[in-house]
Amino acid sequence: MPVITDLIRTEADGSISFGNYELKAKTKKSDFEFEGDLYKIKTFNELTRLEKNELFLYESEPGTAVTHMKETAEGMSFTAWGPEDAQITIQCEPETDYDILIDGEIRDVQKSNLGGKLSFSVKLGDGSAKVQVLKHEAGQQA
């Protein structure tokens, strides 16, 4: 399973990867620039947290590694890796319905809270899960 030993990096496909769930002590890296934005990562075995321009973007408990995270106007996609199941919280638009797809299947349609946070769990079990969180279109069946 991949861990990001340098804590955060850019990928050739225009995405970012971050997190190292193997670390026993909390480790941080600040001021990582990507596409004009500044990122800050805090990661270790109990937690992985990513901030973009000093605002919350991603958090998992326990810690995870995330590969190929991309943000679009429709939502976000990434692959989460970890030694056990994880609770993930991401920043979205406030009070908006989102489809949560895990490994290509719609798991849930969920509304982000007033602050825009959306939480869900992923079954990793010493593996990975491909996650897509996309704005739910009105009239679409879940």
Positions of the model-derived regions?
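A generic structural signal for short, non-catalytic loop/turn and secondary-structure boundary residues
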Residues: 9-11, 16, 71, 81, ...
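C-terminal beta-strand-rich structural cap/linker in extracellular carbohydrate-active enzymes
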Residues: 28-51, 60, 86-88, 112-142
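Catalytic cores of secreted or luminal carbohydrate-active enzymes
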Residues: 2-65
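A short tyrosine-centered beta-strand micro-motif
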Residues: 97-100, 129
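Surface-exposed beta-strand/loop patches in extracellular or lumenal glycoproteins
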Residues: 79-96
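Beta-strand-rich interaction surfaces with strong enrichment in secreted/lumenal proteins
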Residues: 65-68, 75-78, 108-110, 119-123
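Short strand-turn-strand beta-turns centered on an Asx-Gly dipeptide
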Residues: 101-105
